[in-house]
Amino acid sequence: KNGTVKWFNAEKGFGFITSED
């Protein structure tokens, strides 16, 4: 899957990814 990370919180270790299928 290809996607772009819009936001990533390294402190918590997660982020929001917008994937274009």
Swiss-Prot record:
InterPro entries this protein is in? CSP_DNA-bd (IPR002059), NA-bd_OB-fold (IPR012340)
Any one GO molecular-function label of the UniProt entry? DNA binding
**The name this protein goes by in its record:** Cold shock protein CspSt
Localization, UniProt: Cytoplasm
- Which UniProt keywords are listed? Activator, Cytoplasm, DNA-binding, Stress response, Transcription, Transcription regulation
| Coarse class of the protein's main subcellular location | cytoplasm
A Pfam entry, by short name: CSD
Positions of the CSD domain: 1-21
**Statement: the UniProt record of this protein carries the keyword DNA-binding:** yes
Q: What induces it?
A: By cold shock.
- One Gene Ontology cellular component annotation held by this UniProt entry: cytoplasm
**Chain ranges passing through the membrane:** none
Q: Which domain of life is it from?
A: Bacteria
